[in-house]
Amino acid sequence: MSGHLHIGIVVGEASGDILGAALMTELRRHFPNAEFSGIGGPRMLELGFHSYFPQDRLAVMGLIEPLKRLPELLRIRKFLREHFTANPPSVFIGIDSPDFTIPLEGALKEKGIKTVHYVSPSVWAWRQKRIINIARSVDLMLTLLPFEARFYEEHGVPVEFVGHHLADAIPDNVDKTAARQLLGLPGQGRIVALLPGSRSSEVERMAELFFRTAVFCIEQDPSLHFVVPAANSDRYRQLHIELNDFVDFPIHLVNGHSQDAMAAADVLLVASGTVTLEALLLKKPMVVAYKMAPLTYRILSWLVKTPFVSLPNLLAQKMLVPELLQDKATPEALSAAVMNYFENPEQSMAVSQTFADMHRELKCNASARAADAIARLIKPAEAS
């Protein structure tokens, strides 16, 4: 399968650039002379990808910024639709950014171009009617999580679970001692990692709550130490200011090193998000907390169809780790949940073992598996 062919790819986020670059590498196993074009990030460009626009032009967040940028985003999508219609690729792959890529996939599929979407939107959780448009728009959905694939199968959408790239990247066993040495933490004793979020608004809402929780934990066990990894330099400065109210307290603030901080800890207190998957893959017992604006929470409570918010619980389909949201997220309740792991080591070990089983399920060499599925779609007979 060394024939020359053209593969179109559009990614809208930095995480998509990582996936796209790994996918390009694996697709070249099947198609060594393939050409790739569309919109990609720096990692993809290093591999010879031709990007018609800078990838960061699609990187919009929230509700307001996409509206402000809507005319530009529509112009970019129109160009891509017309370009790929005039120069049909053997397959078009949209990675993440579903509000931008799925309508483009639908328009190209109408022209007879095979389409793939890599990384499912959270259609299983909210706005489930999107499945109708997704079914019309894609020839194949590639999911990172097994329960997502089951959802698409139930709705008759061609799908393949390929595994999660983080499960491939994070080792089965992490060295707690080495992580503690790297961060200058005590080699012995109990350590709790506090991860209040990566965005300014999250840190503003969650940091003080997490630090007050640490105070309650210290009252129960004065030997505890805490480590707080800041997502970047801006969050480091923000957290440093928040810590001014907690002087003479055993909290170690570090810039970056979030995985090292989690690896060094015995228990984690985390804001809900992707970090819960990283914590799972590091086999760390965790307590999940989150707060948002009351109106936003009421709207999401009405829209979201799942009983859980954290990936460990979604994967387990049960309350495997504590989730404390909104008014339930108090320092008293969070500290009780954290200390419960220390007071019940058998429970901690059981959670860690379940996480190890989940890691094995998610570790599938995702990029290779995705490339194999795409190759079968392009050339069913030759790729089988």
Swiss-Prot record:
Output the SUPFAM superfamilies linked to this UniProt entry. Answer: UDP-Glycosyltransferase/glycogen phosphorylase (SSF53756)
Which catalytic reaction applies to this protein? a lipid X + a UDP-2-N,3-O-bis[(3R)-3-hydroxyacyl]-alpha-D-glucosamine = a lipid A disaccharide + UDP + H(+)
Pathway involvement? Bacterial outer membrane biogenesis; LPS lipid A biosynthesis
Q: Which GO terms describe its molecular function?
A: lipid-A-disaccharide synthase activity; phospholipid binding
Q: Does the keyword Transferase apply?
A: yes
Instruction: Briefly state the protein's biological role.
Output: Condensation of UDP-2,3-diacylglucosamine and 2,3-diacylglucosamine-1-phosphate to form lipid A disaccharide, a precursor of lipid A, a phosphorylated glycolipid that anchors the lipopolysaccharide to the outer membrane of the cell.
Per its UniProt record, what HAMAP family does this chain match? LpxB
Q: What is this protein called?
A: Lipid-A-disaccharide synthase
Taxonomic lineage of the native organism: Bacteria, Pseudomonadati, Pseudomonadota, Gammaproteobacteria, Cellvibrionales
Q: Which gene encodes it?
A: lpxB
